[in-house]
């Protein structure tokens, strides 16, 4: 089957924003104008297409990144039909993993900002994630119809808070209840959309006289920005003191794709104004898979040399699995992005990360939670597969004869844990199954058994994250459970190097005995980076090679539950350099236990400490409560990083606060500010816990 849409007419984009910036409403308007939906869905009445989970409809927030495909030929039908694959991502910081894995497979992002609230905390988090993957982006300043809307103030805030050159390609005509349309600064025309057909039709007008001077100023600004794209455009600009429309677009596109600028549009999705022009901007200024840097420079699995793959159907097949989702009818759905080549249902491919083959069963095109079965997918496509058995998020799928490993994703470590106890024997059986399925979907969610208390402990990125998991367990899997209080996920490590610690396991009781003897050094590694390092320095065969992996395994088992208080051990290196063995009695088990004893003894001598998670907290508060808020942060062992004015005359306070001090903060903040302040927090790093915390935790173990 030949390709229907040329790859240059593809746009793989994400829609991302702070919570409540109007992101899902904007996506719903995109689906309406592109003909996917024939009626408008609203978030406030729970009818949004992309928010299909019950939890999303109840809370009015987006939890999972829903995917859909649509087509657009321009407001004035001026383009060939372009295929737009859209991923709508969450705005709540507890679901950062959903944003992260979407960013990994996208070519461009639309960042949505509220015309009243401006750049809010989660906007900065998402911006950093887009920077990490070098994704070109354009901004849509939404809610221009709301009281307090100020387009140019938000433009300025984007420049100052996100450290980027912001280039408006539109101006708003009026604001608040007088918002009527936009000025297109490239064409130098005003655009107004019809209120009789929900904005499907539009007309160009002359720019209103009261806006003409401002429009000329910003038009010249974008001409200068476009001219700086290359020498040829700069020559034209210097010769004519202006550029033609097509040259402006070439220059702006070039600089946007190089991440030198962010182009800014505006509108009101709710009032059906501006989303249509945003769609045109997506086609004109965001990259196709051919333009995207991610299509080349991956690592060949076998020889670790750089290998190139381009977004081309003729190249060997390569794809990245970026999300696993449970489906009540078909089991696991594996969402994947094809970078090169073609794959058809029934094809056998290599999972190059796990080094085993997989057969593609059915391939489906997703629209939120609806599916359409298709026979094949090609370079640039985003689809879901049914029937892949052992694929996890971040795995590379590729041609069996041309192995390649694509750039992996980084997943954050969970920072908060709670105990869950099933209420009945039947619940107990179902709970293990349901939690494992949910953990397979979400790499930032972990499940473990505490062997001392025999409790099931679940860990995640925040209280809301775990609340949603428990809610899904109850609704989707019908599991009833008692929930414990949130616990901080501490870590254990050491400060000093300790050498020549011996560990022995000897058992002689008639017949064949057990004998293992190891001598190790342990040493600290750089914090928050390295995890664990095992160095085998055995010389002269004092311990046979077949026992080395058992020694490593014995140490790694101890890392899962540290000697201090049973928390995971991190940032530690172990050097094995001596020991002895017995010809008859030595075994893998004996060396594993000997290593375990040696590690425990060495750890206790190496000045062990507890590490606690530190959160980056941002509080937005009216100025009159600022003193109370800062005082409260200080009482919670917080360190104030800085303060800036926010868009609505208040203060935005940034601080570093230990997670253990943040439980119940939402309630305390509401009461201190009469409900007028809000906050967000995200994990920053682990640092040494104070002695008082250390003593209270270690003494209870």
From Swiss-Prot:
UniProt keywords, alphabetically: Cytoplasm, Elongation factor, GTP-binding, Nucleotide-binding, Protein biosynthesis
Record's subcellular location: Cytoplasm
InterPro entries: EFG_II, EFG_III, EFG_III/V, EFG_IV, EFG_V, EFG_V-like, EFTu-like_2, G_TR_CS
GO molecular function, one term: GTP binding
GO biological process, one term: ribosome disassembly
Positions contributing to GTP binding: 17-24, 88-92, 142-145
Keyword Transcription regulation: no
Coiled coil start-end: none
Annotated tr-type G domain residues: 8-290
One cellular-component annotation, GO: cytoplasm
Taxonomic superkingdom: Bacteria
NCBIfam families, per database record: EF-G (TIGR00484), PRK12740.1-5 (NF009381), small_GTP (TIGR00231)
Protein family (similarity comment): Belongs to the TRAFAC class translation factor GTPase superfamily. Classic translation factor GTPase family. EF-G/EF-2 subfamily.
Function: Catalyzes the GTP-dependent ribosomal translocation step during translation elongation. During this step, the ribosome changes from the pre-translocational (PRE) to the post-translocational (POST) state as the newly formed A-site-bound peptidyl-tRNA and P-site-bound deacylated tRNA move to the P and E sites, respectively. Catalyzes the coordinated movement of the two tRNA molecules, the mRNA and conformational changes in the ribosome.
Name of the protein: Elongation factor G
Organism, scientific name: Buchnera aphidicola subsp. Cinara cedri (strain Cc)
């Amino acid at each position: 089957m030949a390709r229907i849409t040329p790859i240059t007419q593809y746009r793989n984009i994400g829609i991302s924003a702070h919570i409540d910036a109007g992101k899902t409403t904007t996506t719903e308007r995109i689906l309406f104008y592109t003909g996917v939906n024939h009626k408008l869905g609203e978030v406030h009445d729970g009818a949004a297409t992309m928010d299909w989970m019950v939890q999303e409809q109840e809370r009015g927030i987006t939890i999972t990144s829903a995917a859909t495909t649509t087509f657009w030929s321009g407001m004035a039908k001026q383009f060939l039909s372009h295929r737009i694959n859209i991923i709508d991502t969450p705005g709540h910081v507890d679901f950062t993993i959903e944003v992260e894995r979407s960013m990994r497979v996208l070519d461009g992002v639309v960042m949505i900002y509220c015309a009243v609230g401006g750049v809010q905390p989660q906007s900065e988090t998402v911006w950093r994630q887009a920077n990490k993957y070098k994704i070109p982006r354009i901004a849509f300043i939404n809610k221009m119809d709301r009281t307090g809307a100020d387009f140019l103030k938000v433009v300025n805030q984007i420049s100052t808070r996100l450290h980027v050159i912001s280039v408006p390609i539109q101006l708003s005509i009026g604001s608040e209840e007088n918002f009527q349309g936009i000025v297109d600064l490239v064409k130098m025309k005003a655009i107004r959309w019809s209120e009789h057909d929900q904005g499907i039709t539009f007309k160009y007008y002359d720019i209103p006289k009261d806006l003409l001077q401002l429009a000329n100023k910003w038009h010249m600004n974008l001409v200068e920005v476009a001219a700086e794209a290359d020498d040829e455009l700069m020559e034209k600009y210097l010769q004519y003191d202006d550029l033609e429309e097509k040259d402006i677009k070439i220059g702006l596109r070039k600089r946007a794709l190089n991440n030198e600028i962010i182009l800014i549009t505006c509108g009101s999705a709710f009032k059906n104004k501006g989303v249509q022009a945003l769609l045109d901007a997506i086609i004109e200024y965001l990259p196709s898979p051919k333009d995207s840097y991610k299509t080349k420079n991956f690592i060949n699995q076998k020889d670790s040399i750089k290998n190139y793959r381009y977004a081309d159907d003729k190249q060997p097949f390569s794809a990245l699995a970026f999300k696993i989702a449970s489906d009540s009818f078909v089991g696991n759905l594996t969402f994947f992005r094809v970078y090169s080549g073609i794959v058809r249902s029934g094809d056998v491919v290599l999972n190059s990360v796990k080094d085993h083959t997989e057969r593609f069963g059915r391939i489906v095109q997703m629209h939120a939670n609806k599916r359409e079965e298709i026979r094949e997918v090609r370079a640039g496509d985003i689809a879901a597969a049914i029937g892949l058995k052992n694929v996890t998020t971040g795995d590379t799928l590729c041609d069996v004869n041309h192995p390649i490993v694509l750039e992996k994703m980084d997943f954050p470590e969970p920072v908060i844990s709670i105990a869950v106890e099933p209420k009945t024997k039947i619940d107990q059986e179902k709970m293990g199954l349901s939690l494992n399925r949910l953990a397979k979907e979400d790499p930032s969610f972990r499940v473990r058994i505490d062997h001392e208390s025999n409790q099931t402990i679940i860990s995640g990125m925040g209280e809301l994250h775990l609340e949603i998991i428990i809610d899904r367990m109850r609704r989707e899997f019908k599991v009833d459970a008692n929930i414990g209080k949130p616990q901080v996920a501490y870590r254990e490590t050491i400060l000093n190097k300790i050498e020549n610690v011996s560990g022995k396991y000897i058992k002689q009781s008639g017949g064949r005995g057990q004998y293992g003897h190891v001598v190790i050094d342990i040493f600290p590694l750089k914090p928050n980076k390295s995890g664990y390092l095992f160095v085998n320095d055995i010389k002269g065969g004092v311990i046979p090679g077949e026992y080395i992996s058992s020694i490593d395994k014995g140490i790694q088992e101890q890392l899962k539950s540290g000697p201090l208080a049973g928390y995971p051990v991190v940032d530690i290196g172990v050097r094995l350099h001596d020991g002895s063995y017995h010809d008859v009695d030595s075994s893998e088990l004996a060396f594993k236990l000997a290593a375990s004893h040696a590690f425990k003894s060495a750890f206790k001598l190496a000045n062990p400490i507890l590490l606690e998670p530190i959160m980056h907290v941002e509080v937005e508060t009216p100025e009159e409560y600022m003193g109370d808020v800062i005082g409260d942060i200080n009482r919670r062992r917080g360190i104030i990083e800085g303060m800036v004015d926010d868009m609505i005359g208040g203060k935005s306070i940034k601080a570093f606060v230990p997670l253990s001090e943040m439980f119940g903060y939402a309630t305390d903040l509401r009461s201190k500010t009469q409900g007028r302040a809000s906050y967000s927090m995200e994990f920053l790093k682990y640092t040494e816990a104070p002695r008082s915390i250390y003593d209270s935790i270690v003494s209870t173990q």
